[in-house]
Amino acid sequence: MKFLLTNDDGYDAPGLDALRGAVNGNSVTVAPLEHQSGCSHRVSMWGNPLEVTEKGPDVHAVSGTTADCTRVGLIHLVEDVDWVLSGINQGGNLGHDIYLSGTVAGVREAAFQGKPGIAFSHYTRNGNALDWERAGGWVRRVLDHLLEEPLEPGEFWNV
């Protein structure tokens, strides 16, 4: 199974590293060059060319939003993607937050492009440290179940 990974916290975010470890294999990362939290489903328009920089093997940084990253990844960088995964976001994306979330926008754009997606977020209480290794383990367990569940065109999961 081939995954396109993205997020809204930047290509070098610890949550994205944990997600990469959870899929353990056939993935390409296309994520924002800079932090894009709260960018919602904003996309770059005409006269604003996006720059794509290779940051490592199968890791690309885009000078745009999470939705831009998903679109660029699916259209220009990665062929035959089975799933788009976004996250692991630092903070929850619950209720109305999903409309503001760049993390969720990454998989919403995947749904617009005809690909299934899952957005992952790590809720924590103020002052508590995030355990990315543990979060990656939970993502792996959730993936084992959700990847077997069929999604209708235009649908995605938010975990």
What are these model-predicted stretches?
Residues 111-158:
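Glycine-rich, Lys/Arg-enriched anion-binding loops that position phosphate/diphosphate groups
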Residues 9, 35, 65-66, 89-92:
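Short glycine-rich anion-binding loops that position phosphate/pyrophosphate groups of nucleotides
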Residues 92-101:
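Glycine/threonine-rich flexible loop motifs
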Residues 28-30, 60, 85, 116-120, ...:
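Hydrophobic/aromatic beta-strand patches that form the interior of the parallel beta-sheet core
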Residues 73-79, 105-116:
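Alpha-helix C-terminal capping segments
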Residues 3, 14-80:
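A cross-family phosphate/adenosyl-ligand binding-site feature
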Residues 5, 86-87:
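Redox-cofactor binding/interface segments in oxidoreductases and associated redox assembly factors
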